[in-house]
């Protein structure tokens, strides 16, 4: 059995594995199914899967960024990881030039490091959904341990967000981490709200 630091929740390895696989399958499938309609603000009455995809998984920057964070954890270890270390990984591995990703990369290259990299020149995207849609990695690495998940979600979110965009990742990381062991929706919301 895995137990959190506080001893509030316990989760079996089998349950942990099942939830992590469900998380990543869901993220990959959702990203692939949604990609053809991303940035299309029209109502979509989708009745089919686009044949041009041919059953292949599409590139997904939301998932790719989490894999960069996983590599950072594997190489650096959790204790050494902070927003400055993530900024190094961002500069070396995140290639997306658009929106908050591009602003963050440019800021880091100019010496504007987190948390300022999420603020400076980022007025259009600092409150966007780019941070919270990549929060699953912290929950998967810290199941049933929202305090630990939120610590690294903070380091992640402040690279390219601030304000509501930043708080959204803290909220979802806490909720997702707690959801490894807690099933009561109101309790999950209470846990997540306590972090913002």
Task: Please name every model-derived segment.
Residues 1-196:
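Structured, active/binding-site neighborhoods that engage oxygen-rich ligands
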């Amino acid at each position: 059995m895995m137990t959190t630091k506080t001893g509030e929740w316990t989760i079996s390895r089998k349950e942990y594995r099942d939830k992590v696989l469900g998380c990543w399958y869901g993220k990959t499938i959702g990203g692939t199914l949604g990609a053809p309609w991303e940035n299309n603000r029209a109502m979509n009455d989708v009745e089919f899967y686009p044949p041009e995809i041919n059953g292949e998984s599409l590139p997904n920057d939301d998932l790719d960024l989490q894999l960069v964070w996983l590599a950072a954890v594997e190489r650096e270890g959790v204790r050494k990881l902070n927003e400055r270390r993530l900024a190094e990984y961002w500069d070396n591995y995140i290639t997306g030039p658009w929106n908050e990703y591009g602003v963050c990369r440019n800021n880091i290259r100019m010496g504007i490091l987190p948390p300022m990299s999420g603020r400076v020149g980022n007025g259009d995207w600092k409150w966007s959904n780019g941070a919270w849609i990549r929060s699953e990695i912290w929950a998967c690495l810290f199941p049933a341990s929202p305090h630990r998940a939120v610590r690294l979600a903070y380091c992640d979110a402040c690279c390219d967000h601030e304000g509501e965009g930043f708080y959204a990742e803290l909220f979802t990381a806490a909720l997702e981490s707690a959801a490894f062991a807690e099933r009561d929706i109101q309790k999950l919301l209470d846990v997540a709200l306590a972090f913002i």
